[in-house]
Amino acid sequence: MGKLEKIEKFSAKGKVDKLFPFVHDADRQVCLAAIQALGKFTGQMDVMGALSQILDDGDTELRRAAAAALSSAEGSYAESILMHRLEQEKDAGVQNAMRDALASIKSRTK
């Protein structure tokens, strides 16, 4: 079974702890798949912490993916993470992903 299949399997079974190692894989596609999978579990603080750390990564594609994953989060914690990072972010694509995530979160809290 390949890494992408493992990510899909662990995500389907809710085995979040098994997803974390894939976030730092040498294969970017594996990293992106793991980040996307973590987005399904944003109600867990360890997931929020991991996604928050990825927003500091040097890779803009990974930062965009983390912002997109955070869009499924509920509550003010995700908003504060995104707002804080948005103030520091220099890449326009990542900024847009963060704004989209914020809009998505806010639309559910009306």
Residue ranges and their predicted role:
Residues 13, 28-29, 45, 60-61, ...:
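Alpha-helix N-cap/helix-start positions at coil->helix boundaries
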Residues 58-84, 90-93:
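Charged low-complexity stretches with an acidic bias
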Residues 29-40:
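Short, contiguous, helix-prone interaction/anchoring segments in small proteins
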Residues 10-23, 43-56, 75-87, 108-110:
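Amphipathic alpha-helical scaffolding segments comprising HEAT/armadillo-like alpha-solenoid repeats
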Residues 1-13:
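N-terminal intrinsically disordered, low-complexity tails enriched in polar/charged
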Residues 3-6, 34, 66, 98:
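Conserved hydrophobic register position within alpha-solenoid helical repeats
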Residues 87, 94-110:
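Eukaryotic acidic, Ser/Thr-rich intrinsically disordered low-complexity regions
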